[in-house]
């Protein structure tokens, strides 16, 4: 098998693999995770098909709390659901995360981690946002480069589906999220269909 390489940043890599395994995406943009939601919204608008042969239903809400509520509701209805967030936005999702984690719903959150601070203008990379959520019932995966953002993103989705468990897939905001590198391209549609 010939290995194919592409050049992409961490946000796009996570969005690419997420799109393949998602039926509903509840979104609200927040830096540095906004490009993930924007890519999924763009691909959905262009009619791109996911692994299941349908277009992802993207629902933009009024806040991160609304996006988490959308995820909770659609997961209860049986749809594979994803969201993308960071920092203070993740803090607003915690109440819904306890519900989703406690109900063993196969949620996946892709988090471009950023410092949680009273000064919302800080762009420093930090893990306080997702570490605050460690007791919500979500399993945690951490990627350190764009290649891992794609690979562990797929692991998060496949594990959530097979184990009926909620996952946070985290990586450093502004470092991994915006780092552009060449990596081995995972063709989720071709390599993962037999795993679902």
Predicted regions and their residues:
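Alpha-helix N-cap recognition
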Residues: 63, 144-148, 152, 191
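Conserved small/polar residues in nucleotide/adenosyl-binding loops
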Residues: 184-191
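Flexible, glycine/proline-enriched loop segments at strand-loop-helix junctions
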Residues: 136-148, 165
